[in-house]
Amino acid sequence: CIGMDRAAFKELMGPFEVFRNAHSKEQNQLGQEQTDCPKLDLANYEYRRVLGVGGFGLVSLYARKSDGELFALKKMQKALIVQEEMQKFVRQEKLFLAELSGNSFVPILDGSAQDDDSVYLMLEFLSGGDLFSLIEQYGALDESTVVRFTAACTILGLQHVHKHSIAFRDLKLENLVIDSKGYVKLVDFGLAKRILARSYTFCGSPRYCAPEMVTGKGHNKGVDWWALGVVLFETLFAMSPFDDNCDDVELFRRIANEPLEFPGYPQLQPNCTDFITQLLNKDSTKRLGALADGSDGCMKHAWFSDMNWGDLRAQTLKSPIVPTPYKQSEDKSASDAVEVPEMHSVLTKYRQSTDPQAGWTDAF
């Protein structure tokens, strides 16, 4: 236990009154979030096929019977969640999605539910795949079209998340997913956190971690802007700015100490390199996006001088990304009874034990 007087608290966390008021607001919001998401009734949806196996279970495609709109049902086994001690993260993903849903750059959460063995999230189906898959298929992407459009979508997504005092903390190629119109959305809010001042929790994928996180100096929403810089570098060069398959210790040393260098090819517009350079400023107090003007500073950058942000927000701009359209003929007869490795033994142990974090499923 660490003792701290009022002066020490102020130096570390800021004025106590601001912290207290923000904390009260957070608690009020958490109470409200649980009523914002409708309870899921699978009878209102038609099963189509299995999309894949996630970390805790299956993701399956469903169509809403009332209008035919497609959704992805994320079914997560409670036993696996408890085994990996991820109850808190699954719960907060649901709460944050419920709070943030409705924005054009965050997936719609259409409902949630639970039964004895699983928790369920019915999410907007994003048919275009993620940026990682796009780079795997095509290699480095075009700066003036795809990369700039991706950057703009991500800026608006982070702007929405940050307005709720939430740091995303897991921005990476795999968590930027393309919808049917070619727009990019933020997915996977398991590591997101409402940050009132600073957090000292190390999290996220190593090659996207900001210097202040790897050095343990405490971080805030500024880590998301650093991660955006890494993402854009990777989309342009199909390589990481600091990681060339080195171990994590060396990677973190480079992130904290090595200067940013751009490859000689392809040649980029000066405004593009300047934008990325400002995002990858090792000093978080001088990093673009983390300054007093927040996301507005990114939107006003010269690289976006002709970007119509209003049309982008309304999704009336034509995306340079053309996703493969969903075909109903691809639906398979496979049921949701796909085996998850070691599921039976884990499930038996779970049913016979006491959940150490009982109550986390109340959010569903």
Name each model-derived stretch:
Residues 108-117:
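Short beta-strand micro-motifs within the conserved protein kinase catalytic domain, predominantly
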Residues 48-59:
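Protein kinase glycine-rich loop
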Residues 272, 313-364:
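Eukaryotic Ser/Thr kinase distal regulatory-tail detector
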Residues 116-130:
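Conserved short submotifs of the Hanks-type protein kinase catalytic core
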Residues 150-151:
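Activation segment signature within eukaryotic-like protein kinase domains
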Residues 58-80:
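Glycine-rich ATP phosphate-binding loop
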